[in-house]
Each structure stands twice: as C-alpha cells, then as structure tokens.
Amino acid sequence: MDTLLRTHNRLELLYPLHELAKRHFLSPSPNPQNPNFKFFSRKPYQKKCRNGYIGVSSNQLLDLVPEIKKEHLEFDLPLYDPSKALTLDLAVVGGGPLARSCSTSLGGGLSVVSIDPNPKLIWPNNYGVWVDEFEDMDLLDCLDATWSGAIVYVDDRSTKNLSRPYARVNRKNLKSKMMKKCVSNGVRFHQATVVKAMHEEEKSYLICSDGVTIDARVVLDATGFSRCLVQYDKPYNPGYQVAYGILAEVEEHPFDVDKMVFMDWRDSHLNGKAELNERNAKIPTFLYAMPFSSNRIFLEETSLVARPGLKMEDIQERMVARLNHLGIRIKSIEEDERCVIPMGGPLPVIPQRVVGIGGTAGMVHPSTGYMVARTLAAAPIVANSIVQYLVSDSGLSGNDLSADVWKDLWPIERRRQREFFCFGMDILLKLDLEGTRRFFDAFFDLEPRYWHGFLSSRLFLPELVPFGLSLFSHASNTCKLEIMAKGTLPLVNMINNLVQDRD
C-alpha cells in the first residue's frame, strides 16, 4: 500500500517486532536475520512445472524471485566540499522521497546539503496513491499506471466499488524530477550516513560514516524509522503493518484491469487449512493488487495492523494459499518487496534540536499505514517554516529555531487528529477477521468526503467527530456492540490525551 518503509529483497528483523524500531532496519543487509529461512534463491528463476508454470508453493514462489537489480539515475551530482569547512544553513539526512522533497523545497538562496549514502539510487518501492492527492501537489507526471476506481472485497458475498481514481507512482520520474530541482536550486550532496549529532547554541555538527563532519544551523532528519537522531522519551509501543508483495508476470488473473484491488478480505482460500484459517481468523490479512494488464500484476498480502506484527513467513504462506485458490499461475517475478511499518505509538520529544519529518516524527497514519502523500504535502510547510526563521533577523538560538519549526510541523490540530487516528488503530488491533469485515463494510458505506478525508489525513477533529458518529450509525448492531466493548478504554485514553495536550 501507500508506504515508505518498503524494502526490496531486504529485511533485517529481530522478533518480537516491537524491538524493530531500535535499529536502522532499512540499512542494506545481505541476509535475513533468520539463517534457516530462504527469502530468495540465486538460481535461475524461470522455473517450470508439468503444466509449464508454477502452481505456487512457498519455496517455489521464493525461488522465482530474481537477484536485486539496483537502478541508478545517470547525471552528475554537485558534491559537498568538506575542505571549505562552511557552516551550512541546513542539512537534510535521508534518501527517500520525503528527504528529497524537503531538499527540493529548501534549495534556492540557502546553503543546503543532502546526506544520503545512495543519492542516485532509484527507489525500489512500489508506492500507490489516490490520484487527487498527487494532483494537488502537481505530481501527475510522476504516475505510471492509473485505475479509474478501486474495489474492496468484504467477503465472498459483499463488495464495495470505490469511485476514486488510484495510481502507482513512477519511481524514476518522481526521483528524477526532485533531483533536477535540487540541482537547479544549488543543493549539494554528500554520500554517507550520519552516525552522530552534536549541538552548540548556534549550530550542530553531524559526524558521518566516512569521517567527515558537517556543520549546519538546522538538521532535518528524514531517515524513516531509524530513530537515530530524533529522541523519544516515552515507551515505544506501536502497532505494525507487515506485508509481502511481488510484481509478477502471470498466465492470467481474475481481476478487472480497470480497477485496483484496495482490500480483499475473502478467506475461502483457507478452507481445509485449519491452522492457517485459525491464525487468519484471529489476525487477518488482505490482498492488495494493482493489475497492469491481463498477465502483469502487483500482488501484496498485508496485515493491516497487529501488536506484535506478524512474521513474514506467515504472510508469505497466506499469500501462496490465496494465489493457488485464485488460480494465479506465476511465470516470473520482476521484483519482490517486504514492508514493516510502525504505526501509532508516542510522538518524539517536541521540541528538540533535530527536526524530524516522516516516519521518524510519527507522521505515519496510525490507522492505515499511509504516509507518502501526507508527508510529501508537509515538506513545503516545513521548508517554508525553516526558511522563514533562517532569513529573519530574530537572532534565534538553534534550540529556539528548531522549536518553532516543530510547532509548525505538529500544530495542535494535527496532534488532535493523530490522537483520533490512534484511537482508530487501537480498535482495529482488537478486531478479528469478522469484526474487521464489519468495520470496513460500514467504513466504505460512508459519504465519500468522510472516507476520502480519513484515508488522506484531511479530516481534523471538528470533522472527525461527525465522521465517527456517521461510522457508528452505518455499522451493524454487532459492529456497534464491538466498537462499544473494545473501544471504550481507547476512547477514554484519547479524551484524556486531548484534554492534557495544550499549546
């Protein structure tokens, strides 16, 4: 789904997953932490069975995954020159779309360095977005496949047709567009990672993995979920969204190529598989699919949110059972990806000297795992705030300047919105498969302005209250009882947090 924390043939995990956020798990790792589990084979992947194609089993599916093929943009980068020992206005740490968007927005008139170990690397992730979200940001030229609408399979008898265009992001076009603007705005690049930050009253020092120290008045951490620069002072207890996806050539698939499959909660593929069926009944997974043609499709099995998160092996086993049931025969796999997204949990210390944005600043939608459009839209807000304070003659100290930027990033209306989303996550965490189906049956019956706004983080507390009441009124009697039984304590916690949180 719409996520930033996706890895291509890489997953560095120690279970339970709540330990995950203590590590920079997007760092390249040649092997998974479990040496006995084979995520992918280095054998040739055009493997055939008696009918010519794979009738999928877990091992056969993974044997089809090719070796990693890293793609890079081809152009000259203006590099940061450490010999000049200048104090820069801003250092942006990170290499994902958000880091690049911030660098793009902050160039021009300011001295900016982007610290990224692989600045030319094309992101390997599959990003899906609602078309209207990218239209609002003038990024329609960065979409490479569009569907006129989406479909939700609640169960084998009930479907929801969503009249909202959906698209896959063209990763190369998006990065190329951002990089060109960075270069034209005078942004410099330093190919390294930051291992430590030290602060004085007027500036900060970033010590990089290559031994270079970079001085900057403001440090912006856009490294995802590493939590290596931004500090937290509360126990880290998020839920986790976990998914496994493949971009594959198939003999055929049963889906309409004019619609993407937003959620498929059907479980008939688990009939006769007692243990797997029982696990799915307790902590369900759904299929997310983007059909590009009748024989090329992106398929992803996803656990919406769980605490602790499901193991990747479990996700893959469920996916294999689903593909076999749907009669999807895989001819070859272009790429695969693994996704682990911390959702909810506490915000970082606000304010603090390093300014965080994106995953490291708690900006993932706690109920959905969505982040791409929300954070890309936030980048210019943060950029304008930083520019405003840097060019003013107020004489702010480094701490005061960062505090003002944090305030603009997390104003009280955004904090209240996030509290409501965390309330939603806490309810979803307690729902089994049948409860989850009942919830989304009601959710997608809401007026489009409500479910559009909720998924895209466009509703604030004055709109979220009537949204919640409308959802409750659309829910079945059983669903209402579940919400009251399982949502009472989360509701009390939310109200308490809202009362205590004041500007």
Curated annotation (Swiss-Prot):
Name this protein carries in UniProt: Lycopene beta cyclase, chloroplastic/chromoplastic
GO function term, MF aspect, one: intramolecular oxidoreductase activity
Compartments (UniProt record): Plastid, Chloroplast; Plastid, Chromoplast; Plastid, Chromoplast membrane; Plastid, Chloroplast membrane
Targeting presequence: 1-85
Lineage: superkingdom: Eukaryota
Keyword list, A-Z: Carotenoid biosynthesis, Chloroplast, Chromoplast, Isomerase, Membrane, NAD, Plastid, Transit peptide
E.C. no: 5.5.1.19
Sequence similarity: Belongs to the lycopene cyclase family.
Reactions that this protein is recorded to catalyse: a carotenoid psi-end group = a carotenoid beta-end derivative
One Gene Ontology term from the biological process aspect of the record: carotenoid biosynthetic process
Pathway: Carotenoid biosynthesis; beta-carotene biosynthesis; Carotenoid biosynthesis; beta-zeacarotene biosynthesis
Coiled-coil residue spans: none
UniProt key word Secreted: no
Binding-site positions, NAD(+): 90-117
Gene3D superfamilies per UniProt: FAD/NAD(P)-binding domain
Chain's gene name: LCY1
Record GO cellular component, one term: chloroplast membrane
Task of the protein: Catalyzes the double cyclization reaction which converts lycopene to beta-carotene and neurosporene to beta-zeacarotene.
Organism for this UniProt entry: Narcissus pseudonarcissus
